[in-house]
Amino acid sequence: MRKQVAYLGPKGTYAEKAAHILTKLANFQTPIFVPCNGLHSVIKSIAYNNCDAAVVPIENSVEGGVTATLDALWKYPEIYINRAIVLPIKHALISDGELSNISEVLSHPQALAQCSEWLSENLPNACLLYTSPSPRDA
């Protein structure tokens, strides 16, 4: 029977990439990947046995621990960490203009935090605006 694996969607996110890597490490045969609309949806899907596994972020090098995930490990004692990987994250600034003309940068809060040093050096006057995690935004 094919295993269902929940992850923080939509398709094309780093969470999906991590899900593919982790299912290979776990030897899941042709898993079904289930994108979820929020971290709490991913957590609930595994806590309520709606999937066989879930892929969630535990921490990142800039912002530290992901509190929603850590809180879920306390709230749902039946959830446990089976495998962990380090997934390097690479961000890109996409614009149709010159760097000097950029006045706003839109991205997820985690991405803005991870790029804060570069942004402060290269776009010190740009307004940083938070968006939802979506590769479609690009």
Feature annotation, model-predicted:
Residues M1-R136:
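Domain-level signature for soluble enzymes in the chorismate/prephenate branch of the shikimate pathway
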